[in-house]
Amino acid sequence: MAEMKKTIDNKPAPKGEKKANRRGAARLAAVQALYQMDVGGAGLNDIFAEFESHWLGNEVEGDQYLPAEQAFFQDVVSGVVRDQAKLDPLIDVALAKGWPLARIDAILRAVMRAGAYELEHRKDVPARVVVSEYVDVANAFVEGEETGMVNAVLDQIARQFRADEFSRG
């Protein structure tokens, strides 16, 4: 018998719910988790436990959080933590001169780190989709020029890691 995909709250995904919606929720959750780790100093295991038991698929402070694809969420968060020393210089190079990653708001650092990780390691997701999804995530937190910066940085990184996708048109 095929194993049913589980959401981040370990409940089966509703039949009408699309994989893309669960992945989008996982991306948003990953960015929130990375932000919390960055500003609050929380550890990976604590973050996983908190998000899996209290946030996703639940109502928190009046907001209903969507179920998320647990494996995808964990992959992005743990991958960014593992590869951050490699990802940060890539993002720094893609940022405009005079704007090192350390000067960028913590939530945008989390967005760009997650996007850069996914571009490098999640070849199952087209690069343009990754960039678009993380621009959408950024839009949940900031407006205007900041989302343009996220788009430009991730597009540059995408062309570095996935040049073949862009050469095909």
Swiss-Prot record:
Gene of this entry: nusB
Lineage: superkingdom: Bacteria
Function: Involved in transcription antitermination. Required for transcription of ribosomal RNA (rRNA) genes. Binds specifically to the boxA antiterminator sequence of the ribosomal RNA (rrn) operons.
Gene Ontology molecular-function annotations: RNA binding
Protein name: Transcription antitermination protein NusB
Species this protein is from: Rhodopseudomonas palustris (strain BisB18)
HAMAP family reported in the protein's UniProt record: NusB (MF_00073)
Compositional bias per record (Basic and acidic residues), positions renumbered to this chain: 1-19
PANTHER family to which the protein is assigned, alphabetical: ANTITERMINATION NUSB DOMAIN-CONTAINING PROTEIN (PTHR11078:SF3), N UTILIZATION SUBSTANCE PROTEIN B-RELATED (PTHR11078)
Gene Ontology biological-process entries: DNA-templated transcription termination; transcription antitermination
Keywords noted in UniProt: RNA-binding, Transcription, Transcription antitermination, Transcription regulation
Keyword Secreted: no
InterPro entries: NusB-like_sf (IPR035926), NusB_fam (IPR011605), NusB_RsmB_TIM44 (IPR006027)
Entry's Gene Ontology cellular component terms: cytosol
Region spans: Disordered: 1-22
UniProt key word Cytoplasm: no
